[in-house]
């Protein structure tokens, strides 16, 4: 046979001719569970799935014709296999869809597990409170995932003084269930303020590990509040039901959990304004009250004063107690103010300098990445007690 070099298009066209010319793949019927329905530009894309296989399908113009597919239903689909040359992929072009009188395997598993947890009262347990200002956050996800990067980016943007602990696990595939359980158990050993479980979007099958009963039971054993951010918009996984808070995406979960430093400053400013106004109003009110009381006493004749000397002394005693009470309230408010000041000071970006860290600046701007520097650059090193110049040599 002669050697011949094919282009990618030629190979894909040849495969297309083979498959679309095969009578066993034309005008055939396939049954399976409907999953991952995605209307797009008037067409409907979806998958037919069974336990270990998936067939990508499309109904051209189906969305415009008002066709609405039901996730989890078993269906008999008629059509032909086609090859999409630009991507080198094949899919099933549907001409007709008929529902079968039963639900699919994944839907049965989902409903069975959910019902079992409901009967045990595990879905109605009291939710743990997510702290407003967490300092130590555990993240259960793949260390290489975009979901983890979304959380880290959000933390940087919000300039939050937090520590992040990553517990690596696969989030789909054959090993995901076992790895996820190990990660959950490991996180439970740490002294954390809360745990986030995050991953990007995917099909029902991709997200299935978050419906596994033993994974759900392990989540329920966590001592810490749990926030999920599993990237899906339509269907919820069971992990969302048992979490203390569930968000649609990793970024949404991060924004819910991680406080924004600027918002903290605004809250403190608002609190201080209200505190000062409240104290001022209370002092003014009590001052007017005492002045009125003193004026009334002066209007009483001397004889009346002599007869009511005991009452006057009582009034003085009450006035003294009132002043003491006001001072006690002021001291309590002052303690709150000092506590808020300490919290504000903890957000000071220069505090780490007192622990031996150094702030690097180039042309007055803080250097955040090593890629921002090149050989020969002159930088300023800011220590807690002063600034030194340095030159990058490598």
Swiss-Prot record:
It holds the Pfam family tRNA_anti_2. Its main location: cytoplasm. Its EC number is 3.1.11.6. The keyword Cytoplasm applies. One of its GO terms (biological process) is DNA catabolic process. Signal peptide: none annotated. InterPro entries: Exonuc_VII_L, Exonuc_VII_lsu_C, OB-fold_nuc-bd_dom. GO terms for molecular function: exodeoxyribonuclease VII activity; nucleic acid binding. Keywords: Cytoplasm, Exonuclease, Hydrolase, Nuclease. It catalyses: Exonucleolytic cleavage in either 5'- to 3'- or 3'- to 5'-direction to yield nucleoside 5'-phosphates. Heterooligomer composed of large and small subunits. Belongs to the XseA family. This is Exodeoxyribonuclease 7 large subunit. It comes from Thermotoga petrophila (strain ATCC BAA-488 / DSM 13995 / JCM 10881 / RKU-1).
């Amino acid at each position: 046979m002669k050697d011949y070099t094919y282009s990618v298009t030629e190979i894909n066209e040849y495969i297309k001719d083979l498959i679309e010319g095969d009578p066993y793949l034309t005008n055939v019927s396939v049954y399976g569970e409907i999953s991952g329905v995605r209307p797009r530009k008037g067409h409907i894309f979806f998958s037919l799935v069974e336990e270990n296989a998936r067939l990508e399908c499309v109904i051209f113009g189906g969305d415009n014709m008002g066709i609405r597919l039901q996730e989890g239903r078993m269906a008999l689909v008629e059509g032909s296999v086609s090859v999409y040359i630009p991507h080198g992929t094949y899919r099933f072009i549907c001409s007709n869809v008929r529902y079968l009188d039963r639900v699919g395997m994944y839907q049965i598993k989902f409903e069975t597990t959910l019902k079992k947890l409901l009967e045990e009262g595990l879905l109605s347990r009291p939710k743990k409170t997510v702290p407003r200002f967490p300092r130590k956050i555990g993240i259960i996800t793949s260390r290489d995932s975009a979901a983890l990067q979304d959380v880290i980016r959000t933390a940087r943007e919000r300039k939050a003084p937090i520590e992040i602990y990553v517990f690596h696990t696969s989030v789909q595939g054959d090993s995901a269930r076992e790895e996820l359980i190990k990660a959950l158990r490991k996180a439970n050993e740490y002294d954390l303020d809360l745990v986030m479980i995050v991953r990007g979007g995917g099909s029902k099958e991709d997200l299935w590990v978050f419906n596994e009963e033993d994974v759900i039971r392990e989540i329920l054993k966590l001592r810490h509040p749990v926030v999920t951010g599993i990237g899906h918009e339509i269907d919820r996984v069971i992990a969302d039901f048992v979490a203390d808070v569930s968000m649609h995406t990793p970024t949404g979960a991060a924004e819910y959990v991680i406080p924004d430093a600027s918002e903290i400053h605004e809250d403190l400013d608002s609190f201080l304004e209200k505190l000062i106004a409240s104290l001022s109003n209370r002092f003014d009110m009590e001052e007017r009250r005492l002045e009125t009381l003193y004026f009334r006493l002066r209007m009483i004749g001397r004889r009346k004063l002599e007869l009511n000397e005991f009452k006057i002394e009582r009034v003085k005693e009450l006035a003294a107690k009132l002043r003491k009470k006001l001072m006690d309230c002021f001291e309590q408010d002052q303690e709150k103010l000092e506590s808020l000041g300490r919290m504000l000071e903890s957000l000071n970006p220069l505090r780490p300098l007192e622990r031996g860290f150094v702030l690097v600046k180039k042309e007055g701007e803080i250097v955040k990445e090593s890629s921002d520097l090149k050989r020969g650059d002159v930088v300023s090193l800011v220590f807690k007690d002063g600034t030194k110049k340095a030159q990058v040599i490598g």
